[in-house]
Amino acid sequence: MAFLKKSLFLVLFLGLVSLSICEEKERETKEEENEQEDDNREEKRFLSLIPHVISAIPHVVNALSNLG
């Protein structure tokens, strides 16, 4: 009977350990996906600013030419 209890505890322990490892890998995968999404959002924000910067260049050039 004691052998059966020890075996059952061992099986439960190993099952919990493997479950914990799987959950940790899943968590890491989700974190990596979130980081990639954040990077994509930042890139899109940057790209949306380019037309505004380009349209501001003539104003900056005019302001600099008026100073000189």
UniProtKB/Swiss-Prot annotation:
N-terminal signal peptide: 1-22
Q: How is expression of this protein distributed across tissues?
A: Expressed by the skin glands.
Q: Which family does it belong to?
A: Belongs to the frog skin active peptide (FSAP) family. Phylloseptin subfamily.
Protein name from the UniProt record: Phylloseptin-SP1
The task this protein performs is described as: Weak cationic amphipathic alpha-helical antimicrobial peptide with weak activity against Gram-positive and Gram-negative bacteria and fungi. Has been tested against E.coli (MIC>217.69 uM), S.aureus (MIC>217.69 uM), K.pneumoniae (MIC>189.00 uM) and C.albicans (MIC>217.69 uM). Shows a moderate hemolytic activity.
Indicate whether Signal appears among the record's keywords: yes
Q: Name one GO biological process term.
A: killing of cells of another organism
